[in-house]
């Protein structure tokens, strides 16, 4: 069979067109991911600056002021310093576990951002099991901490890793029961559907008023999951030097530093999504999603308004964990476990049973 040059050119141009389509498809997949990573990076830098400024205000002292205007570049300066420090390995530790541990902690938290809606249709993965995927992914992080503690071949590091694992297990269950109660109220486990279910009545439609007990339990459990005071037992300086971070230096120590603030930001974002109405305004019967369909300008400003509302609620909520750091003393290990197993677990289970009963009676 003879094929002339015209047909060959047509076939070649077709394959070139198909390859270009594949390249464009890959680019359109990567753009949202890179945008999200850039936004998360900026968000973490803002949290570090806010914590230092709020902490300085609480302690009546001057915060960072030399690295950039108002000290906003202080976190960037700290990260650059850690980046150029020597990366040491323990002589008798397990080098593979020691190196993998920080990466597991950071990656597991980063994956949680994929199901967070920052606005109407502004979510990387709108899944029907969104909130439970977050819980499943976040439960991987303590494994990385335990690997870091064991791989360091240091008694303080190992005890810190064990404390982190025990603390995570103790508070993961009440947290899951609170999320399950929200899913029952919203008739969905999708983060987008949960926000939409709170939108009709504005401020009074928030799950904060429908689930006040669940909100308090979720707040306490999320503080414990983030290892913030008064739940920072895995890193207690007076007892364990620096816990599972004791043997780390350089960029690996910086990864733990970043993971702590990433976890704090993702917890605050989920509080906004689950209890504070997400991207919706506080005015009843006015929805940000309707702004998309008004005109072309609305299609541009609608997502911006949604992102602004979500981040405003998130950063306002962040004042609570920052303030508790300088307000409450650290718990003992037995007090921490008793609080999780003897108080929060029964109360969250009772809250779930009440929510289930009310939903059944409303049918």
UniProtKB/Swiss-Prot annotation:
This is NAD(P)H-quinone oxidoreductase subunit 1, chloroplastic. HAMAP family: NDH1_NuoH. It holds the Pfam family NADHdh. It is an enzyme of class 7 (translocase). One of its GO terms (cellular component) is chloroplast thylakoid membrane. The chain crosses the membrane at residues 26-46, 98-118, 127-147, 246-266, 268-288, 300-320, 336-356. Its EC number is 7.1.1.-. Belongs to the complex I subunit 1 family. The lineage of its organism: Eukaryota, Viridiplantae, Streptophyta, Embryophyta, Tracheophyta. It comes from Coffea arabica. NDH shuttles electrons from NAD(P)H:plastoquinone, via FMN and iron-sulfur (Fe-S) centers, to quinones in the photosynthetic chain and possibly in a chloroplast respiratory chain. The immediate electron acceptor for the enzyme in this species is believed to be plastoquinone. Couples the redox reaction to proton translocation, and thus conserves the redox energy in a proton gradient. NDH is composed of at least 16 different subunits, 5 of which are encoded in the nucleus. It catalyses: a plastoquinone + NADH + (n+1) H(+)(in) = a plastoquinol + NAD(+) + n H(+)(out); a plastoquinone + NADPH + (n+1) H(+)(in) = a plastoquinol + NADP(+) + n H(+)(out). One of its GO terms (biological process) is aerobic respiration. Its main location: plastid. GO terms for molecular function: NADH dehydrogenase activity; oxidoreductase activity, acting on NAD(P)H, quinone or similar compound as acceptor; quinone binding. Keywords: Chloroplast, Membrane, NAD, NADP, Plastid, Plastoquinone, Quinone, Thylakoid, Translocase, Transmembrane, Transmembrane helix.
